[in-house]
Design a protein with these regions (language model features):
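N-terminal intrinsically disordered, cationic/polar leader segments
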Residues: 2-122, 128-174
């Protein structure tokens, strides 16, 4: 597969905006795959006979990455959907979806945002379709997860890392 494949995100018109320039850097997706997939339907078939009108659905999302070699990274997008009514669990869907990516020519400063923001953004439509199919195949209406702000997820992960580091430094001084 060449670096000019249709699976690359091409540079965008930056117009002098540094953030747009960073977002326009090239990222290559070499492979996408399911690492783990789980669907629990604990109250079937009873819940399917008389389904509730408006269940409470909680969506969880997390992003992680690890280096595979000097050029490639495995990006892991974890999605969970937990649906319940006041007294019954409807379903629990969990997906760990991964991709092998590289960012040729990216500077060290641009690499982390490309891996942790742009790669999950490219992976999300595929992961969302898997969750939707899984809930439909489980006997429920297909769950369509709304678009996710991966910049906010990235910033939240950085804040958690800073808090954990500060906490460990405080614990070490005591």
């Amino acid at each position: 597969m060449s670096d000019n494949s249709t699976e690359t995100q091409t540079e965008t018109q930056a117009g002098g905006n540094g953030q747009a320039e960073a977002a326009g850097r090239q990222i290559v997706v070499h492979a996408q795959y399911i690492k783990d997939l789980s669907f629990e339907n604990p109250n079937a078939p009873d819940i399917l006979i008389d389904p509730p009108q408006q269940p409470d659905v909680q969506i969880g999302v997390n992003v992680g990455a690890r280096g595979l070699n000097s050029e490639q990274y495995e990006v892991i997008l974890s999605l969970s959907a937990n649906a319940k009514t006041e007294d019954k669990a409807l379903f629990l869907a969990e997906l760990t979806y991964a991709a092998i990516v590289s960012a040729p020519g990216a500077s060290r400063d641009d690499l982390n945002p490309l891996i942790m923001i742009e790669a999950p953004r490219l992976m999300f439509p595929f992961a969302r379709a898997i969750i939707s199919d899984m809930t439909r195949d489980g006997g429920f209406m297909p769950l369509s997860i709304q678009p996710i702000d991966f910049v906010a997820v990235y910033q939240s992960n950085i804040e958690r890392q800073k808090e954990a580091l500060a906490s460990s430094e405080t614990d070490g001084e005591a």
